Amino acid sequence: MESGSEEPDEQLLLLSEPALHAGPPAGRAAPGGAVRLRGEPGLEEEEEGEEDSGPEGDGEEEPLLRASGRGRRAGAARDKEPRVGAGHTGHAIDMNTFLDDPEFAEIITRAEQVIECGVLPERISQGSSGSYFVKDCKGKTIGVFKPKSEEPYGHLNPKWTKYFHKICCPCCFGRGCLVPNQGYLSEAGAYLVDDKLGLGVVPKTKVVWLVSETFNYSAIDRAKSRGKKYALEKVPKVAKKFNRIGLPPKVGSFQLFVEGYKEADYWLRKFETDPLPENTRKEFQSQFERLVILDYVIRNTDRGNDNWLVRYEKQDDGLNLSDKDIQWTVTEESTIKIAAIDNGLAFPFKHPDEWRAYPFHWAWLSQAQVPFSQETRDLVLPRISDMNFVQDLCEDLHELFKTDKGFDKATFENQMSVMRGQILNLTQALKDGKSPIQLVQMPRVIVERSSTGSQGRIVHLSNAFTQTFHSRKPFFSSW
């Protein structure tokens, strides 16, 4: 195992004062989550306490590149954890209000209504955590809900895989670079980053509260629910004093379901025997580059070729489509689209430097050897080369992550230091015309904000950032 032990030669660079501008419209919801409406005091969902860990890093330090003078919007609506009003039957309608996205709000409202009508979410058999297909009144899947308490290391995870992992192999339990039990925020944060960068590869994902009999609750919660419902029937006057009737709502990520997609592994094998037309190949390469940028910026530690999806609508060229194994859609013009799902193991507070490197599995594909296209560079480079844009992105993530009751500001700053370092590397790679494989081989960097720097969306004169090369490598490293 390699370890950097040199004392860093640190230099700070004061960034120029950018121009101010007007703030956002009033009533803007916190990005990636619902506006929390406070009701009568009541019971909240019981969650397992989370451990906060500090960062590790060593190596040489250099001053960060200069910032541009453009400013971004300031401020966002602050939200609080919800409480269920007295006499509440257990549904979460009052908790899910999305002022900036009425279309998504309507989808969640319909989901809550059909659950109350008896169309319950269905647990997904795959995976190592409790996740659920949420359906509409016709039984059609409209979204995937992943409760915080049922994440791989959550105390109510209904699957035993991680429990045996913890008991039989505690030394390798969990990922030492990630904040435990924060996957639902990582899912919503990945969509936030995707939306800010204009990538369009992550299905819309936000934090919501839902309640259903099919979710995994403790025996105590279920017993309380039965007792309160019985009291409501027998002694209504007493039951009216209860803070909540029914099971407690669960907080988690809700991702809109995408139709017509299959695992990337399936299509990659198909493309080996049936190559794509040139125009479609270029479109696929462009989509692939957007996936690369997303994963690299959020430092996804769990990206295999089985958890990103491809939808291929093949042009009608007169072929015999009787082969049931070829499940593509026939259109007048071929189109291809990538969907990046399963983003719950991202936003580490340090670069992986213990046992495993958690590589990006797309790095071994032939598409990763092609330099980033001019289209991708024109889309992303103007945004990430502006430090005010990067700071605004960090503030949006802060608004999202702080809604978790286990939020720790110091740990969050470490997460942002890693992300800023990834963005710095990406900026240089796009300027130099590098390929995705060359990008992941660049030295790992963290960019820390000085303790005297002010919090806010605009980089002020008082802000100073330090660039540090992280030289310590994992025991099992791919590059």
Curated annotation (Swiss-Prot):
It is an enzyme of class 2 (transferase). GO terms for biological process: endosome organization; Golgi organization; phosphatidylinositol phosphate biosynthetic process. Its EC number is 2.7.1.67. Residues 118-449 form the PI3K/PI4K catalytic domain. PROSITE patterns: PI3_4_KINASE_3. Residues 18-34 have a biased composition (Low complexity). Residues 159-172, 262-270, 355-364 are annotated as: Important for interaction with membranes. Keywords: ATP-binding, Cell membrane, Cytoplasm, Endoplasmic reticulum, Endosome, Golgi apparatus, Kinase, Lipid metabolism, Membrane, Nucleotide-binding, Transferase. One of its GO terms (cellular component) is cytosol. Contributes to the overall PI4-kinase activity of the cell. This contribution may be especially significant in plasma membrane, endosomal and Golgi compartments. The phosphorylation of phosphatidylinositol (PI) to PI4P is the first committed step in the generation of phosphatidylinositol 4,5-bisphosphate (PIP2), a precursor of the second messenger inositol 1,4,5-trisphosphate (InsP3). This is Phosphatidylinositol 4-kinase type 2-beta. It comes from Gallus gallus (Chicken). The gene is PI4K2B.
